[in-house]
C-alpha cells in the first residue's frame, strides 16, 4: 500500500447532490478549480460540433456553455453540456444540463439536473430555489434522460422524474 499527499481540489461525486455541488464549485471563486489555468489543462475528445451560439436575447452570467449549445434565454450559475438549447424567454439557474437538453420558451429550471435529451416544455417549471420551499422539503430536482416535461407542468423541488414520466420524491 502507498499513499500520496494530494493538495488540490477533489470531490467524490457518487451522489446526485455531490455531482451538483462539484459543478457549482467549478463556477465558484476560490474553490480551487480554475478552468483557465494553463498549468492545469483539461483534455477532452474533439468532436466536430459548432461553437456555442449566444443569440441577441441571451443573458449568460457566471456559467459554462459548451460547444453546439444555443442560448436565446437566460442562463445563470449553471453548466450546459454540449448541444443544449435554452429558448428565448426561458430561464436556467443553478442547474446542470446534460447533452441535448432543451428548455423551451417561457420555461424555468432552477436548482436541477436535467439528463441527456430532456425536453422541458413551454412555460413548465422544474425545481425551485431553497427560499421557495420549507427546508425539510427542499432539494435538487433531477430529471432522468429522455424525459419529456409537458408544457405548463410544474415539477417541485426535491423531485425525481424518470423517462416514463413517473414522479417521485427524492
Can you say where each PLM-predicted feature lies in the sequence?
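Left-handed beta-helix
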Residues: 1-170
